[in-house]
């Protein structure tokens, strides 16, 4: 029997009936549906609709549904999806209750609508997944920090316009990505803060027709408070869109990391050696080791952002309140959540196993005039305005290019032909160590500043991990040193 069949004389067209069902994807909301149903039962008991015994019987029956769904053999999802009668997860759970406790199972729907049920289920789903992804972000950030600590004072070129710019510590580069991940975690926290209100009691559109204490269900589900407007509560999917936009930000940051690793793994750079456990070969070229993981990460941003774009278009122009269009927001949500979860899990393990060729990185810092900024700063300390110092060092670079040498390879006479302010102390000012340390400002790549940043980031990632938990990646320790690092 349909949940709404009383008004209709004709049965649904079989093709349409199959097409409009959502159980094939909203089965993923079963834990949330059970939790929301338990909370609603508490409100019904307080309102005198259910006796304490009836409420307990419903709770026990709902527990049986949960136990079957989480069967050790993993058959739970197929058990739900194979049901031929239920049109959605709400109907499925009701059918299971009726099979267990008879007509009492039908009584649970008193004072509630599927419109508020799905709004509640989705808020619970997004909240739990946002917090789970925060744990993955914290775990990956923690590994980035551990790898940064291993790098010590090893340096690498930093790039602007994909051209060598200035040397930075490898740790400074790794910590840049940790900063991005903490911002991503913060966006998820903001998303949770705005969605954390309970729609139960909103009814189909105008509010429940029973005098329910909405605070009971809200408190039982750990929401901050009940929602304030029934029309908004049943039709709001802002939180889905905001969550997907936050996932897009995560994917964008992951894709930047993936792109750099893909480049740095080429023979032309030679800065990293890809872990074999996360690489594949070629069916035609025996010598190949391909960066499939990082290439797929780059591609995933398209799918995740595509989910956000799809939901944007689905919600555009919808009149108040609930419309069936909103059912279509679920698949993009589920798919993007799974893709982000899998991506972060693999990137954390990949980063742990990544082998840095610090000898190649360091060698790359010694050519390409990466100390030109330090040379200009040297002249500034001699009293020359920066614009003039910039011009003078530019001429020195041109002279070095013509001679085939770096700035330190120019003689003092050659340098003084460009400016009399050059002295013998110039050569100490443009060593790699001096070039790094001239950036001695908060957030700069000077060795002392990076050490301070590293210690601060250890505390910040620790706070996130303590709040959301550390994901067990099956690694011996996040600080394990790769013996291939050199």
UniProtKB/Swiss-Prot annotation:
It comes from the Bacteria. SUPFAM superfamilies: L-aspartase-like. GO terms for molecular function: argininosuccinate lyase activity. It is found in: Cytoplasm. It is an enzyme of class 4 (lyase). CDD domains: Argininosuccinate_lyase (cd01359). Keywords: Amino-acid biosynthesis, Arginine biosynthesis, Cytoplasm, Lyase. The keyword Plastid does not apply. It catalyses: 2-(N(omega)-L-arginino)succinate = fumarate + L-arginine. Its EC number is 4.3.2.1. Gene3D superfamilies: Fumarase/aspartase (C-terminal domain), Fumarase/aspartase (Central domain), Fumarase/aspartase (N-terminal domain). One of its GO terms (cellular component) is cytosol. One of its GO terms (biological process) is arginine biosynthetic process via ornithine. Pathway: Amino-acid biosynthesis; L-arginine biosynthesis; L-arginine from L-ornithine and carbamoyl phosphate: step 3/3. Belongs to the lyase 1 family. Argininosuccinate lyase subfamily. PANTHER family: ARGININOSUCCINATE LYASE (PTHR43814:SF1). HAMAP family: Arg_succ_lyase (MF_00006). This is Argininosuccinate lyase. It comes from Acidobacterium capsulatum (strain ATCC 51196 / DSM 11244 / BCRC 80197 / JCM 7670 / NBRC 15755 / NCIMB 13165 / 161). The lineage of its organism: Bacteria, Pseudomonadati, Acidobacteriota, Terriglobia, Terriglobales. The gene is argH.
């Amino acid at each position: 029997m349909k949940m709404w069949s009383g008004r209709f004389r004709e049965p649904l067209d079989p093709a349409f009936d199959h097409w409009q069902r959502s159980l094939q994807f909203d089965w993923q909301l079963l834990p949330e549906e059970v939790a929301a149903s338990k909370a609603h039962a508490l409100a019904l008991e307080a309102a005198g609709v259910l006796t304490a015994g009836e409420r307990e019987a419903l709770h026990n029956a709902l527990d049986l549904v949960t136990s079957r769904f989480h069967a050790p053999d993993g058959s739970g999802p197929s058990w739900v999806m194979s049901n031929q009668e239920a049109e959605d997860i709400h109907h499925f759970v009701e059918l299971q209750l009726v099979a267990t406790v008879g007509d009492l199972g039908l009584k649970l729907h008193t004072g509630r609508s599927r419109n508020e049920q799905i709004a509640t289920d989705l808020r619970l789903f997004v909240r739990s997944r946002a917090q789970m992804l925060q744990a993955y972000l914290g775990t990956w950030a923690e590994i980035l920090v551990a790898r940064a600590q291993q790098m010590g004072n090893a340096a690498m070129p930093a790039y602007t316009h994909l051209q060598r710019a200035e040397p930075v510590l490898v740790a400074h580069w790794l910590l840049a990505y940790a900063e991005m991940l903490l911002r991503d975690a913060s966006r998820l926290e903001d998303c949770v803060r705005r969605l954390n209100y309970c729609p139960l009691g909103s009814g189909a559109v105008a509010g429940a027709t029973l005098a329910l204490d909405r605070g009971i269900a809200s408190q039982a589900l750990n929401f901050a408070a009940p929602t304030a407007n029934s029309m908004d509560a049943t039709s709001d999917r802002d939180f889905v869109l905001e969550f997907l936009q936050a996932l897009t930000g995560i994917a964008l940051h992951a894709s930047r990391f993936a792109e750099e690793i893909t480049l740095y793994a080429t023979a032309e750079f030679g800065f990293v050696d890809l872990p074999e456990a996360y690489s594949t070969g070629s069916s035609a070229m025996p010598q190949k080791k391909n960066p499939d993981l990082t290439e797929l990460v780059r591609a995933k941003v398209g799918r995740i952002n595509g989910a956000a774009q799809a939901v944007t278009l689905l919600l555009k122009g919808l009149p108040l309140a609930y419309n069936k269009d909103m059912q279509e927001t679920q698949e993009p949500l589920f798919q993007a959540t799974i893709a982000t979860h899998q991506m972060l899990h693999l990137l954390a393990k990949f980063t742990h196993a990544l082998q840095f060729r610090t000898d190649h990185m360091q060698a790359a810092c010694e050519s390409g005039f990466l100390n030109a900024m330090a040379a200009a700063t040297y002249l500034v300390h001699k009293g020359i305005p920066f614009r003039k110092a910039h011009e003078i060092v530019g001429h020195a670079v041109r002279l070095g290019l013509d001679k085939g040498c770096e700035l330190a390879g120019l003689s003092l006479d050659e340098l003084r032909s460009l400016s009399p302010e050059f002295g013998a102390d110039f050569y100490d000012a443009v060593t790699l160590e001096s070039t790094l340390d001239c950036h001695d400002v908060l957030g700069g790549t000077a060795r002392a500043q990076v050490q301070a940043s590293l210690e601060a980031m250890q505390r910040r990632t620790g706070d996130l991990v303590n709040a959301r938990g550390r994901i067990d990646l099956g690694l011996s320790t996040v600080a394990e040193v790769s013996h291939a690092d050199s």
